[in-house]
Amino acid sequence: MILDTKADILVTHSFHFNNTKMHGLSGHLFEVLDYYWYFKNKGVNVKCLIPEVVTKETFNDFIKGHYSVDFDLNDMYFLDTKILAIKARNILVTDGGYWFLNQYKSKLLGNVFSFACGPSFLESEDKPEYVTFLADHKIYPGLGINYTKKVLPHLNHIPGDKPFAHITKNCRALSESQIKDLIRDYPDIVMYSDYLNIQNSTNKPIKNFNFSKYVYTPIMRHFDCSPRLIIECRILGIDFDLWNINYKDPGLERRLETDLDQFILGASDNIINYFN
């Protein structure tokens, strides 16, 4: 099956090509939605491919649990079956690493753009030349177009009374001893997780940022390409702790810079100028 969206811009991330559907809820899904909303409000014929987690039936409830603005369900593709290729005039991949973009070149039919994401951009020379990269040069010096990935600020917030952590197997998994230490330090913490089955964990996303504090936990690769929940907490005035971060992470350090405005996606953003 070839998905011909007939869109000027299709926004997606790479997980729809993964047979295992193992990634679960991640910030890349919200990046897809953020940039869809931005392009839509610029009058662009834009579509989204939602790879996993959200279905057509759960989409509206999912949106209301995060955003304070509306999204057009008719612009969303939810696919339960594998597709051979996706087609649009321009395709924006929010999480494309070199491996994915090289492996699936034949499946991306259109002008391909990708946000830089992960340490592979700093370590690999196997750059896919058919892709236009949008990369923050403070993290990825000299790669593609200098562009800082941003966060849509239109967020629903219902304050909560417990700290929160995001513990998922994709890249944020913690060892058993780390989990015990985390609960010791935050006895009433609520953890969203797709693999834990303990009293403090839930496999249901926390809606409306309903927590008192975000506890940012270590990631295995020591490189968080765009920790958006840090920015969302800063936008909403929610406290956050950096728990056991005893390593240097250029992506995290970038998001902790004082100037919050540089990370907020607004109407004046210039990303639209790079698409034809």
Task: Identify the function of each model-found stretch.
Residues 35-38, 102-108, 125-129, 177-185, ...:
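A short acidic, amphipathic alpha-helical/loop segment
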Residues 21-38, 42, 137, 142-204:
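Conserved catalytic-core segment of nucleotide-activated headgroup transferases in glycan assembly
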Residues 209-222:
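Acidic donor-binding loop of glycosyltransferase active sites
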Residues 1-99, 188-189, 198, 227-230, ...:
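N-terminal pre-catalytic "stem/leader" segment of glycosyltransferase-like enzymes
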Residues 84-86, 201-212, 235:
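Short acidic alpha-helix that forms the nucleotide-activated donor recognition element
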Residues 15-17, 52, 118, 170-171, ...:
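Residue-level signal for short, function-critical loop segments
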Residues 73-179, 260, 264:
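Catalytic core of nucleotide-activated saccharide and alditol-phosphate transferases
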Residues 117-121, 194-198, 220-221, 245-246:
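Short, acidic/turn-prone active-site loops that include or flank metal/cofactor-
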